[in-house]
Amino acid sequence: MLDKTRLRIAMQKSGRLSEDSQALLARCGIKINLHQQRLIAFAENMPIDILRVRDDDIPGLVMDGVVDLGIIGENVLEEELLTRRAQGDDPRYTLLRRLDFGACRLSLAMPIDAAYDGARGLQDCRIATSYPHLLKRYLDGQGVRFKSCLLNGSVEVAPRAGLADAICDLVSTGATLEANGLREVEVIYRSKACLIQRDGEMPPAKQALIERLMTRIQGVIQARESKYIMLHAPSDRLEEIMALLPGAERPTLLPLAGDKRRVAMHMVSSETLFWETMEQLKALGASSILVLPIEKMME
């Protein structure tokens, strides 16, 4: 039996979100020994239990209050939400935040040699998908009648097998579609991983732990999106240089030994520093420009 005083987090056991979810928790300082076959893991340094389950089970576990938090793709979450509403349920949860991994898109795809002139050309077509409610919502909005062929895997083989005229499936690079003689024709939903919380009041200790975890997740994501920049800058060009480097706060300026005309500038930049920007900095008189990754960050 799980200790209900501990925070319970559901995450994908295996698949495209599993490794990124594990890495996120590790970078948040949560020490978990995840054995490949173990479905429940316990944090060594925090009162947190990890349930490793199928991704399409995670929304239900959160909505039904079995776990406190879940890391899940928005596509799976939205499909479960639409499914429950179609059954007359009123599913509840709280979206804590979108995460910076698991990006994909749910797209319509057709055989490479098939003509496509918009969604209305799919009128009365048979479409294979694992996301029937997301597909229905989109095509209903386009005024398109269609027949759904529900498949829970290998959706891309449906046209060749004569099961469907088109498919609606997740796409990351498009390589799988191409390998099966298909081409992406329309994106109907864009998705990333997200963190969700069950509905209802949390015990104070659990809520405090969730807030600590959210602060750490925010720091991890900010650190990944930011760079620490050090450079030497002419004292009379500081405002121009700072305009090229959007930062979290004003930079730290330090005097340079034996040089009254320049200063050392240290700052966190919240945007990617491209080569073009570095060339612009150099043109303004900056030198010794260093761009460093940030491991952890807390504002």
From Swiss-Prot:
UniProt record similarity statement = Belongs to the ATP phosphoribosyltransferase family. Long subfamily.
The reaction(s) catalysed by this protein are: 1-(5-phospho-beta-D-ribosyl)-ATP + diphosphate = 5-phospho-alpha-D-ribose 1-diphosphate + ATP
The gene for this chain is: hisG
Tell whether Cytoplasm is among the UniProt keywords.
yes
Pathway noted in the entry: Amino-acid biosynthesis; L-histidine biosynthesis; L-histidine from 5-phospho-alpha-D-ribose 1-diphosphate: step 1/9
Keyword list, A-Z: Amino-acid biosynthesis, ATP-binding, Cytoplasm, Glycosyltransferase, Histidine biosynthesis, Magnesium, Metal-binding, Nucleotide-binding, Transferase
One Pfam family in the UniProt entry: HisG
MF terms from GO for this chain are:
ATP binding; ATP phosphoribosyltransferase activity; magnesium ion binding
Question: What is its cofactor?
Answer: Mg(2+)
According to the UniProt entry, how is activity regulated?
Feedback inhibited by histidine.
* NCBIfam families the UniProt entry points to: hisG, HisG_C-term
Which InterPro entries does its entry note? ATP-PRT_HisG_long (IPR020621), ATP_PRibTrfase_cat (IPR013820), ATP_PRibTrfase_CS (IPR018198), ATP_PRibTrfase_HisG (IPR001348), HisG_C (IPR013115), N-reg_PII-like_a/b (IPR011322), N-reg_PII/ATP_PRibTrfase_C (IPR015867)
Q: Its GO CC terms?
A: cytoplasm
Choose any GO biological process term that the UniProt entry carries and state it: L-histidine biosynthetic process
Its function, per the record, reads:
Catalyzes the condensation of ATP and 5-phosphoribose 1-diphosphate to form N'-(5'-phosphoribosyl)-ATP (PR-ATP). Has a crucial role in the pathway because the rate of histidine biosynthesis seems to be controlled primarily by regulation of HisG enzymatic activity.
Protein location: Cytoplasm
- Answer yes or no on keyword Membrane: no
Task: Please identify the protein, giving its name as recorded.
Answer: ATP phosphoribosyltransferase
What EC number(s) does its UniProt record assign?
Answer: 2.4.2.17
Q: Which residues form a coiled coil?
A: none
Q: Which organism is it from?
A: Edwardsiella ictaluri (strain 93-146)
Under the heading PANTHER family, the entry gives: ATP PHOSPHORIBOSYLTRANSFERASE, ATP PHOSPHORIBOSYLTRANSFERASE ATP-PRTASE
Its quaternary organisation is:
Equilibrium between an active dimeric form, an inactive hexameric form and higher aggregates. Interconversion between the various forms is largely reversible and is influenced by the natural substrates and inhibitors of the enzyme.
